[in-house]
A protein has these predicted regions:
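Phosphodiester-processing cores and adjacent nucleic acid-binding clamps
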Residues: 1-232
Length: 232
């Protein structure tokens, strides 16, 4: 229920160029019963880490600078205080050799992931292995690449257009185990999240509006007999 409230509010209250978004105030209001993960490289926590790395480069590579990842640590503590044991730090590995795929993402993941793991241990937050999903099967990567071109108004042969890693399919447990074989606890924590999720059925049947039948039409059955299927 709280998730539905957040999603609805994200579209209505403060959308950005018709893109849904929320702020921390809304999370504080509707966080009960939700599980929160730190997201991909575009998430708040990885972005703070990358900002720290950039500043670190400006400090002549002083990796031991006390404030290098202060903003990232403050971010972790905020979410941990709000969600408790339902807050997880994500790591992803989108290594790719596919032609035309983005190679840079994995390079950044290799730099950011060790920091994520280190900060997770420092703050007592569990790490979870995840994979961005934009299409279902591996062979759908090329179709997705074409759709990205359509949505961004670029040609396939445009070198400066948006590229994905072509690793964003719904990977099997076996594929994820191979990718994260060196961090088995991250895979175990994925199952932990699954066990936490409440099982429920989604009613996929049509939900029709209720139209009151005027008294002069009698019952619903008599109303139905008055008109043919074509009339209706």
């Amino acid at each position: 229920r709280n998730l539905c409230r957040i999603v609805s509010a994200s579209f209505m209250e403060d959308s950005y160029y018709r893109r849904p978004r929320i702020d921390r105030d809304l999370l504080e209001q509707y966080h009960e019963g939700l599980i929160c993960c730190s997201a991909c490289l575009g998430g708040e926590l990885p972005q703070k880490i990358m900002e720290g790395m950039s500043a670190m480069g400006g400090e002549n590579g002083n990796i031991n600078s006390e404030n290098t990842f202060q903003a990232a640590e403050e971010t972790i503590e905020w979410y941990k205080n709000l969600f408790g044991e339902d807050y997880y730090i994500e790591i992803q590995r989108h290594q790719t050799t596919k032609p035309g795929a983005d190679q840079h993402v994995y390079q950044v993941q290799r730099e950011v992931n060790p920091v994520l793991v280190e900060l997770a241990k420092k703050h007592g937050v569990r790490v979870v292995a995840t994979n961005d999903v934009h299409f279902v099967e591996e062979e759908h990567a090329e179709a997705h690449d074409h759709l990205v071109c359509v949505s961004t108004n670029h040609f396939i042969d445009d070198e400066n257009r948006m590229h994905y890693t072509k690793q964003e399919w719904l990977k099997s447990p076996q594929e994820m185990e191979e990718i994260f074989s060196d961090i088995p606890e991250a895979l175990e924590n994925t199952q932990e999240i699954v066990d936490k999720v409440e099982v429920y059925d989604i009613d996929s049947g049509p939900i029709m509006p209720k139209f009151p039948i005027p008294e002069e039409f009698g019952t619903e059955e008599s109303c139905r007999q008055t008109f043919t299927e074509q009339d209706l």
